[in-house]
Amino acid sequence: MKNPSLHRYATRPGLYFTDDGGADAVVRSETADQVWFCVLEPLDQPSAFYADAARLFNEPGLTFIDQAKKQRICTRRIPSLNLRETLFRMDGPNYGLWYVHVPQAWDGMQYGYRVNGPWDPNHGVSFNPYKLLLDPYAKGIEGKMELDPGAFAYECEIKNGKVAGSPFGPMSTVDSLGHMPVSVAIDDRDINKHMGEPSHPHVPWSKTVIYELHVKGFTANAPWLPPELRGTYACLLYTSDAADEEDS
């Protein structure tokens, strides 16, 4: 069997802005049946995807997830939260990755994922499409977790500040939106975006190197440090012109 060719953006998980004004979203799941990339917008503002998405309406006996399964791109209104959620059905899995190109994306865009699949907690599988999931590769997060039944994948109640319910019980069909944080897209392609803000270097992750070292071994013979500070944690607080020259 011939393996399918990789898409241009199906190389590593994350959200990547593209030159056409959109973004490529990639997430990993080898066991999901379906994955949606979900964009959240204020309800009182025009949607960026008005011309692309099918509208979902409240229909008796038909949930928004059931409707979303039939559409490539769909949107729903959530008046109680003043939000509009647009769901993009992702392609996959391709080598364990799901991917989609979003036609429009912007710095500060709120988003998340919904994933459909088996509900079998006894075997470690707890897919629940009614729960918005954070992007594990998100560069920003906004909001907070609430102690609310909607925040849990299984049916439960909150009694006296404690959760009453079993994680091995029935799947919850309460939407988690409004009870959990959401992912935030950060456009860090412009390395000069935050020039003049010395409180944070704002180095793009694509140009960042994380270097792990042992303080004692790294500084024991450092010529730019006073002898009494070499090999100690105190040297981490030391600054001088010599140290700046060494760093450069």
Model regions: which residues?
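Single conserved hydrophobic/aromatic residue that forms the stacking wall/gate
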Residues: Y238-S248
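N-terminal structural segment of carbohydrate-active enzymes
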Residues: K2-S240
